[in-house]
């Protein structure tokens, strides 16, 4: 037998091990950094909570959230990544903390996977291990655009609510799909797609949509969050439209530590004299808000 054929037989018997994916090392070493961005109650200027934003190690190939997500999807490790990010955020948050709630992102597909009782125990265990009460946690449902397993998603969000968590629906647009999911999941927090709150002062149609969505939020008992609020004028517009909560660079940049007070420039805007909008009549009747939305669904920035 030749040496070549012997080597081939040995390779078949003991195949070479596949090298671990680089993301595996990131998760095993805990090489993740958490930043916290404040979410502000617009009527009072108080800190409602902070969204936890996770990054990879600085100057690494997986520094950005998108790079981490792309690597996780390629390696079929998205749930592992998201649970690791959640654990890291809870660990860094600490207990007790003086600045309200912590907002944690979980994709709709991961929540579907966690709807199985055995998997859900892993999620529940994170709150216990890091001593953060579930009542101080808001789970943001992200990446729900292409989801089809609505029953499993609803099972998981219902189980989280039973623990005491609040549910937030992220990246909501004035589209029929977003509104259907809103009414189905009944989240206590609705976070608008950032395109709906950017450059508001130059797009009056957006302010009309904000007012209509604010009415719908009132009727469903949800708090509406405007994201990407980047200047004083846009802050005034979202406040005057009746939006409850806001986040963005004008209100506070993501930082390694949570803050207990709003920055001075935003406090000055919110301290200006203004008249809060009247709430819509007949809470629970969605017809008026839905009628207004029908005229706006499908506009260019809501696809």
What are these regions (language model features)?
Residues 33, 49-51, 101-105, 136-140, ...:
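Structural preference for beta-strand elements that scaffold enzyme active sites
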Residues 130-133, 163, 219-220:
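Helix C-cap/helix->beta junction micro-motif
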Residues 61-70:
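PAS and related sensory helical modules
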Residues 31-57:
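Active-site and channel-lining beta-strand-loop segments
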Residues 91, 118-125, 152-162, 180, ...:
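Alpha-helical scaffolding segments of alpha/beta enzyme cores, especially the outer helices
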Residues 79-152:
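Catalytic core of bacterial c-di-GMP phosphodiesterases, primarily the EAL and HD-GYP domains
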């Amino acid at each position: 037998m030749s040496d070549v054929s012997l080597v081939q037989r040995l390779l078949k018997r003991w195949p070479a091990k596949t090298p671990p994916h680089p993301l595996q090392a990131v998760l095993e070493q805990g090489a993740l950094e958490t930043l916290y961005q404040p979410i502000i109650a617009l009527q009072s200027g108080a800190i409602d909570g902070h969204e936890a934003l996770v990054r990879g190690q600085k100057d690494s190939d997986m520094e950005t959230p998108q790079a981490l997500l792309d690597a996780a999807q390629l390696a079929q490790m998205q749930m592992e990544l998201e649970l690791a990010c959640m654990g890291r955020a809870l660990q860094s948050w600490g207990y007790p903390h003086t600045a309200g709630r912590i907002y944690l992102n979980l994709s709709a597909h991961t929540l579907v996977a966690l709807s199985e009782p055995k998997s859900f125990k892993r999620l529940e265990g994170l709150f216990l291990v890091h001593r953060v009460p579930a009542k101080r946690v808001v789970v943001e449902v992200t990446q729900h655009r292409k989801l089809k397993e609505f029953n499993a998603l609803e099972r998981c969000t219902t189980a989280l609510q039973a623990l005491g968590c609040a549910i937030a629906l992220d990246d909501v647009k004035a589209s029929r799909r977003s509104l259907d999911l809103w009414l189905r999941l009944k989240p206590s927090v609705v976070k608008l797609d950032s395109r709906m709150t950017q450059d508001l002062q130059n797009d009056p149609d957006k302010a009309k949509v904000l007012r209509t969505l604010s009415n719908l939020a009132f009727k469903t008992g949800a708090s509406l969050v405007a994201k990407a609020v980047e200047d004083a004028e846009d802050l005034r517009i979202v406040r005057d439209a009746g939006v409850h909560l806001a986040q963005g660079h004008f209100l506070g940049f993501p930082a390694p530590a949570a803050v207990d007070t709003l920055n001075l420039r935003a406090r000055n805007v919110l301290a200006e004299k203004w008249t809060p909008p009247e709430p819509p009549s007949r809470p629970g009747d969605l017809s008026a808000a839905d009628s207004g939305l029908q005229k706006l669904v499908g506009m260019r920035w809501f696809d």
